[in-house]
């Protein structure tokens, strides 16, 4: 469901059953409507938490003006104290990345592939570690070469590959993130139905759910914690170097 549809569906069922929405707009969440989309906050927390574990202290977060970019940078700033990071924010001006007069430990560029590629080329010789999100994934050989060494938070590609093979064999074409989320949502509903726990309490079970888009555990406020893989492009492939639990 979209954000608008989620609100309407939540009102229509009036709490009789939980509503899973595929939106990544955290504003629609409440005690009966659960945001199941991959959110900017989840991705930002995952990559920044990993960066902190690797010794990063000072981060410059780049707001590119897109909804995802703005929300990611805002989420990063909100997590600053919790992660013991110092996070400054730079707003993209005229499409140009900020000049790193005093380089931070890391540059967080949550936006799409083109911007991350530009940042990677700019930061390559500066000693600054580049941090990115699933939005940066790009499988073109020249892009993989440019992204070499970048830390990226993404749903686990191995999980997705297994789903994608099955999807393609049955339906043709290659599935996207929405198809994977839809499959996961249907699988969760089926699991709850089979256990006769198709209720809010069932959805909030401590064990969570093993999904194509990562292990998830739902919270009572309508959000969910999602596991992420940390990927690093090396020698033309994305290498999984760590897992982030429950971002």
Model-predicted segments: where are they?
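Segments of small-molecule ligand-sensing domains
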Residues: 170-242
